[in-house]
Swiss-Prot record:
Modified residues annotated as N6-acetyllysine in this record: 183
Domain notes: IleRS has two distinct active sites: one for aminoacylation and one for editing. The misactivated valine is translocated from the active site to the editing site, which sterically excludes the correctly activated isoleucine. The single editing site contains two valyl binding pockets, one specific for each substrate (Val-AMP or Val-tRNA(Ile)).
Chain's gene name: ileS
Motif ('KMSKS' region): 602-606
Entry function: Catalyzes the attachment of isoleucine to tRNA(Ile). As IleRS can inadvertently accommodate and process structurally similar amino acids such as valine, to avoid such errors it has two additional distinct tRNA(Ile)-dependent editing activities. One activity is designated as 'pretransfer' editing and involves the hydrolysis of activated Val-AMP. The other activity is designated 'posttransfer' editing and involves deacylation of mischarged Val-tRNA(Ile).
EC number: 6.1.1.5
UniProt-annotated location(s): Cytoplasm
Protein name from the UniProt record: Isoleucine--tRNA ligase
Origin species: Escherichia coli (strain ATCC 8739 / DSM 1576 / NBRC 3972 / NCIMB 8545 / WDCM 00012 / Crooks)
NCBIfam families assigned to the protein according to its UniProt record, in alphabetical order: ileS
InterPro entries referenced in this protein's UniProt entry, alphabetically: aa-tRNA-synth_I_CS, aa-tRNA-synth_Ia, Anticodon_Ile_BEm, Ile-tRNA-ligase, Ile-tRNA-ligase_type1, Ile-tRNA_ligase, M/V/L/I-tRNA-synth_anticd-bd, Rossmann-like_a/b/a_fold
Top-rank taxon: Bacteria
'HIGH' region (motif): residue ranges: 58-68
Length: 938
């Protein structure tokens, strides 16, 4: 028997079946680096319209976690897809390098500044530490396949950037947005510094909850207000608080103007409370026998005075909108130095912003004899005992409540009035302008807009000063006596910025004021404060984007970070840009959710449910991680676990197998010589290219809308359904058995070539390593890298006016599905082995019958059977299977007649009819020794 294997066009490619990504990717990365792939892309895109995604700088501390990976991969997908869409999209990664966490790390190793090291040496250690952290994170980000200018990232500690941060502050001062004030700020007594809102976390804490009576100074005036004369004992206004330690700073009692307040007679005294809370307060203080003597509106009590229980002065009743009936007594203890609401209302009434607490959290000398030098959290019991002794304590109990804590130390923080510098939200209309700017930005998802609007509408002035060592100095000089800024502040700041540009922030601390102030130096002092690190990162639109040459003066198109950044980087950037330039720093803001485990739980080392990106890359490869990120809807929480990553690996295999099939069947195809013109191609091949065209339209639309999970779903549908379960199955016969250089085979290869050219580009932003690998195996002249090109433009489809248009093939797909069901049943019943052992008769109503008949003998190739006949629907025998999908179709199956051809495996009656090729069928004889078969349709 002759061996006809050598006459077949068997698929062949060096493209491996197994991805082996964990092993193969590092070598590809090395090639990208050696070739300077990022530089090649920049050169290729030079002069195109720009799309700038500005990197929000991660903090230079610790290893990257899965959340970092999600963030960088999403950015990379966008940058690469924009490149393929014809944009020049430079990506400059950055790092946030100043601030408390780095100081704490350096402190742990070397001690506090001023102990073993000078502050200057301490700063040098911080700079060194940040640089090593940047290097570690950079390696991991590169390993993810993220392309960017990794050799020249921006660091907020670059001398030039530090100088530009100072310049940004100068511009804000010049525009009139800075003011100084004693104001309550979140204060950590362990850090001994003010904290930004983003540095505050909430934990449960147990505190004493107390009801305290403030006796009225003028009892008769109160009786008159309530129109009563018979009151037994003194009258008091009762406040409720869970922070007894703040009582020394009390300067008023806030009540609501529109609430009804009741004068309640209890044993030996009368108390004033909100009428709606009388019952709950009486229950709490254990009084069952009480009488309401009268009621008045809160507004009636404004400015009546009450004696502080132990401080020896009296305080006014004032009206505030922050008073609620949720808990307490309807009268709020007000200490302007210890709370933002208290501060705001204190300003309105001209109250003192008293601050009896030092930076270490202990009372300052002269506060009160038994409290001086005591830590405020230890003082609660002393204050309670004091109130008891003075007869002012009506009730005390322990209460668990949510309390603000330092994100670093996890210890409770306090509100403490300190002299700080603020960017004012209202003195020059910053709030109003920011709210206006928000409306001109596209927020993705769109709920981001309402979220940041409410934050901007309600946020207090931004405290931008910090009492730290490792940070950008505010670079201000204030008058010794008046504490006013130097009249030449902007000039002086530019002078400092020039020095910082050369020598870094240490230049400020080394600066002798005489050098730039001359004789005035004796009258001015250098402000020792540093800037909040959120000012560093929030000003990068100016300190980085405006000055990097690759951005050519264009503003950022997009900021993309986790959803916690509405209150963080998106907010600080908006504030600074609007204060500097009167406009938002971005056109689009995209936020992604946090990563959770497979059960939806937050990632936590203590639960042990964290997923390390390094582990995933070492086991499965970066492309699997990238595919997981792309296939997850980032607008909500992003679940990741071993099981979920395994599913991503399964999807990856399907895509890889499709790519491998295309490459293997392009064996021997040279597009320059072998390409078949569309009008000469087999109709099914044109249909397949049309499928790719339709898929490309959907995929490009999804990339444009940043719907990457839609990209993956459409890609999977194309690979699995349109190609895998239909087209690629059908063409195997023609690919393998037709004459190597026949139109029948070259038409098919032409289709596969067009499909592969499109597919490799669809994959490139997401499966970057695999796309690069596929690119290397594609036939034909091409650039070295897929990333330098654009979406494939060589796709075409069938015209609707053609008889065998898309609708025709859609119906054929359904027919084939119905035939497959019948074949599967026959296989289960052991009537046939494979589908080529079967012949089918399709009993069809006239319209469908005409379509099926149009394919002639090629119908069997579409159905993958050895025989296919079309007959009248009404002639169907009783055992023909009625289609559930197509009402006008019944299918009958019989065993195919004739012998099996060993070359094409079809059963046919003409095997052995040609003497020289006695073992094979007539079709194969023609393909081996004759002119070759002709195919028109399939």
């Amino acid at each position: 028997m002759s061996d006809y294997k050598s006459t077949l066009n068997l698929p062949e490619t060096g493209f491996p079946m197994r991805g082996d990504l964990a092993k193969r990717e590092p070598g590809m990365l090395a090639r990208w680096t050696d070739d300077d792939l990022y530089g090649i892309i920049r050169a290729a895109k030079k002069g195109k319209k720009t799309f700038i995604l500005h990197d929000g700088p991660p903090y230079a501390n610790g290893s990257i976690h899965i959340g970092h990976s999600v963030n960088k991969i999403l950015k990379d997908i966008i940058v690469k897809s924009k490149g393929l869409s014809g944009y020049d999209s430079p990506y400059v990664p950055g790092w946030d390098c100043h601030g408390l966490p780095i100081e704490l790390k350096v402190e742990q190793e070397y001690g506090k500044p001023g102990e073993k090291f000078t502050a200057a040496e301490f700063r040098a250690k911080c700079r060194e530490y940040a640089a090593t952290q940047v290097d570690g994170q950079r390696k991991d980000f590169i390993r993810l396949g993220v392309l960017g200018d990794w050799s020249h990232p921006y660091l907020t500690m670059d001398f030039k950037t530090e100088a530009n941060i100072i310049r940004a502050l100068g511009k804000i001062i010049g525009n009139g947005h800075l003011h100084k004030g004693a104001k309550p700020v979140h204060w950590c007594v362990d850090c001994r510094s003010a904290l930004a809102e983003a540095e505050v976390e909430y934990y449960d804490k147990t505190s004493p909850s107390i009801d305290v009576a403030f006796q009225a100074v003028d009892q008769d005036a109160l009786k008159a207000k309530f129109a009563v004369s018979n009151v037994n004992g003194p009258i008091s206004l009762v406040i409720w608080t869970t922070t007894p330690w703040t009582l020394p700073a009390n300067r008023a009692i806030s009540i609501a103007p529109d609430f009804d307040y009741a004068l309640v007679q209890i044993d030996g005294q009368a108390v004033i409370l909100a009428k709606d809370l009388v019952e709950s307060v009486m229950q709490r203080i254990g009084v069952t026998d009480y009488t309401i003597l009268g009621t008045v509106k809160g507004a009636e009590l404004e400015l009546l005075r009450f004696t502080h229980p132990f401080m020896g002065f009296d305080v006014p009743a004032i009206l505030g909108d922050h008073v609620t009936l949720d808990a307490g007594t309807g009268a709020v203890h007000t200490a302007p130095g210890h709370g933002p609401d208290d501060y705001v209302i204190g300003q309105k009434y001209g109250l003192e912003t008293a601050n009896p607490v030092g930076p270490d959290g202990t009372y300052l000398p002269g506060t009160y004899p038994t409290l001086d030098g005591v830590n405020v959290f230890k003082a609660n019991d002393i204050v309670v005992a004091l109130l008891q002794e003075k007869g002012a304590l009506l009730h005390v109990e322990k209460m668990q409540h949510s309390y603000p804590c330092c994100w670093r130390h996890k210890t409770p923080i306090i509100f403490r009035a300190t002299p700080q510098w603020f960017v004012s939200m209202d003195q020059k209309g910053l709030r109003a302008q920011s709210l206006k700017e928000i409306k001109g930005v596209q927020w993705i998802p769109d709920w981001g807009q309402a979220r940041i609007e409410s934050m901007v509408a309600n946020r207090p002035d931004w405290c931008i000063s910090r009492q730290r060592t490792w940070g950008v100095p505010m670079s201000l000089f204030v008058h010794k006596d008046t504490e006013e800024l130097h009249p030449r502040t902007l000039e002086l700041m530019e002078e400092v910025a020039k020095r910082v540009e050369v020598n870094g922030i240490q230049a400020w601390w080394d600066l002798d004021a005489k050098e730039i102030l001359g004789d005035e130096a004796d009258q001015y002092v250098k402000v020792p404060d540093t800037l909040d690190v959120w000012f560093d990162s929030g000003s990068t639109h100016s300190s980085v984007v405006d000055v990097r040459p690759e951005f050519a003066g264009h503003a950022a198109d997009m900021y993309l970070e986790g959803s916690d950044q509405h209150r963080g980087w998106f907010m600080s950037s908006l504030m600074i840009s609007t204060a500097m330039k009167g406009k938002a720093p971005y056109r689009q803001v995209l936020t992604h959710g946090f990563t959770v485990d497979g059960q939806g739980r937050k990632m936590s080392k203590s639960i042990g449910n964290t997923v390390s990106p390094q582990d995933v890359m070492n086991k499965l490869g970066a492309d699997i991680l990238r595919l997981w990120v792309a296939s997850t809807d980032y607008t909500g929480e992003m679940a990741v676990s071993d099981e979920i990553l395994k599913r991503a690996a399964d999807s990856y295999r399907r895509i890889r197998n499709t790519a491998r099939f295309l490459l293997a069947n392009l064996n021997g195809f040279d597009p320059a010589k072998d390409m078949v013109k569309p009008e000469e191609m087999v109709v099914l091949d044109r249909w397949a290219v049309g499928c790719a065209k339709a898929a490309q339209e959907d995929i490009l639309k999804a990339y444009e809308a940043y719907d990457f999970h839609e990209v993956v779903q459409r890609l999977m549908r194309f690979c699995s359904v349109e190609m895998g379960s239909f087209y690629l199955d059908i063409i195997k016969d023609r690919q393998y058995t037709a004459k190597a250089d026949s139109v029948a085979r070259r038409s098919c290869q032409t289709a596969l070539y067009h499909i592969a050219e499109a597919l490799v580009r669809w994959m490139a932003p997401i499966l970057s390593f695999t796309a690069d690998e596929v690119w290397g195996y594609l036939p034909g002249e091409r650039e070295k890298y897929v990333f330098t090109g654009e979406w494939y433009e060589g796709l075409f489809g069938l015209a609707d006016s053609e008889a065998m248009n898309d609708a025709f093939w859609d119906e054929l797909l359904k027919v084939r599905g119905e035939v497959n069901k019948v074949i599967e049943q026959a296989r289960a019943d052991k009537k046939v082995g494979g589908s080529l052992e079967a012949a089918v008769t399709l009993y069809a109503e006239p319209e469908l019958a005409a379509k099926l008949t149009a394919l002639g003998d090629e119908l069997r190739f579409v159905l993958l059977t050895s025989g296919a006949t079309v007959a009248d629907y009404n002639d169907a025998p009783a055992d023909a299977q009625q289609s559930e999908v197509l009402k006008g179709l019944k299918v009958a199956l019989s065993k195919a007649e004739g012998e099996k051809c060993p070359r094409c495996w079809h059963y046919t009656r003409d095997v052995g009819k040609v003497a020289e090729h006695a073992e094979i069928c007539g079709r194969c004889v023609s393909n081996v020794a004759g002119d070759g078969e002709k195919r028109k349709f399939a």
